[in-house]
């Protein structure tokens, strides 16, 4: 776990014109749709009376220590409607990662329709030279690295296939001006733990503020939150390293082994499936399968 002194001093304060309202440039942890806010909202709802603006205010906070990792829970409450939002922050110290998710709670008597419920939003230091790295591909060409300078406006990676696949992977990496390599350089990175329709939005405004928001895709999706019910978003795990993309990969890999995978299999060698019909196409018989098995044995396959 790195110390706070490892990360240097905060960047310069934002300079804005007098006619630019603070609501338009404030860096909220979980912005809701409504008022004069122009960046990607994490939360967008429709109340039973047709009102769609959400005005969230801090209500309380708690630190939980009875789980696998210490967890901060910040509760926000709408000023006018019975809607509570719990922001969860799990600190995985040994992995240098923060896991975030949100819980929406309807404490009233009427249903609330959830139209967008992202898991988290991450703010980056002020800079206009960021490079975004993503992973995409196809059958036979999985996990191709794509790199692009973060433009003014939005850059969206997404999947509308109903699954997470080689075509679009819910992961991002960001560095300054393409200066990071596998072994050195500042890298901000994260992965969304969700296998359905998802999106990650990277957005930079005219003042050089850059943020990353992600979660369940709002495309063709709404959720009816009845009275007394709650809705929990998937987790969005993110971190920072000054040691390049290689260290970012290893931090996520160790997290997957130590936290995500079942305890019964995380520390054991898993069996390998040898897809033998590829070498014979559909002409499968005992002789050619036995020959393939002998070659597999020479490679160390059990």
Where are each of the predicted segments found?
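Short acidic, Pro/Gly- and aromatic-enriched capping/linker segments at domain boundaries
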Residues: 208-226
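Polysaccharide-binding surfaces and accessory modules of carbohydrate-active proteins
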Residues: 1-203, 219
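Conserved, mostly hydrophobic/aromatic
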Residues: 102, 227-228, 274, 296
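Short, Lys/Arg- and Gly-enriched loop/turn segments at beta-strand edges
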Residues: 239-251
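Short Pro-Gly-centered flexible turn/kink motifs
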Residues: 53-56, 223-242
């Amino acid at each position: 776990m790195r110390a706070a002194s490892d990360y240097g001093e905060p960047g310069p304060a934002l300079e804005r014109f007098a006619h630019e309202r603070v609501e338009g440039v404030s860096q909220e942890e979980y912005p809701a749709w409504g008022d004069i806010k122009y960046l990607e909202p994490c939360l967008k709802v429709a109340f039973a009376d047709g009102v769609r603006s959400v005005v969230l205010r801090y209500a309380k906070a708690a630190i939980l220590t009875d789980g696998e990792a210490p967890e901060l829970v910040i509760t926000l409450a709408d000023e006018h409607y019975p809607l509570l939002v719990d922001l969860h922050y799990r600190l995985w110290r040994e992995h240098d990662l923060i896991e975030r998710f949100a819980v929406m709670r309807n404490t009233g008597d009427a249903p609330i329709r959830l139209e967008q419920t992202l898991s988290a939003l991450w703010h980056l230091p002020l800079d206009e030279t960021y490079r975004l790295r993503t992973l995409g591909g196809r059958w036979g060409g999985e996990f191709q690295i794509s790199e692009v300078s973060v433009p003014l406006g939005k850059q969206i990676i997404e999947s509308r296939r109903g699954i997470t696949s080689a075509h679009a992977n819910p992961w991002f990496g960001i560095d300054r001006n393409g200066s990071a390599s596998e072994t050195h350089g500042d890298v901000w990175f994260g992965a969304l733990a969700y296998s359905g329709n998802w999106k990650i939005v990277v957005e930079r405004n005219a003042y050089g503020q850059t943020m990353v928001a992600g979660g369940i895709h709002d495309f063709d999706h709404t959720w009816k939150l009845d009275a007394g019910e709650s809705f929990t978003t998937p987790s969005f795990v993110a971190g920072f390293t000054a040691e390049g993309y290689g260290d970012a990969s290893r931090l996520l890999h160790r997290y997957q082994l130590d936290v995500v995978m079942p305890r019964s299999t995380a520390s054991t060698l898993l069996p390998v499936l040898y897809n033998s019909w590829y070498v014979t196409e559909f002409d499968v018989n005992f002789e050619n399968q036995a020959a393939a098995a002998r070659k597999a044995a020479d490679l160390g396959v059990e």
